[in-house]
Amino acid sequence: MNPLLVRQAIEYAVLLCDKYNDRIVITINGSGGMGNSTEIRPYCDEGFCFDPSLNAIIVTRTEGKTFIDTDSIKTIHCYKQKI
């Protein structure tokens, strides 16, 4: 996926997190089929950011960090979590 689009999608997801008090789920689907997806849940203390120098999204969880290369990303979805 185009790095500029990825950056805009992540910036929009950050705005949604602020608007809905971190109650969103972000799903990133890669190029490996249906089983190759990553879910980010900010309300579970999972962080995310776009690093332009690495051309990747960095997902931070309690067990460590995951790097997702923007070239492998096919879709990014944001969902509002129901309370």
Where are the predicted features?
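A general, composition-driven signal for non-globular sequence regions
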Residues: 1-2, 59, 74
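Acidic, low-complexity, intrinsically disordered interaction modules
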Residues: 27-66
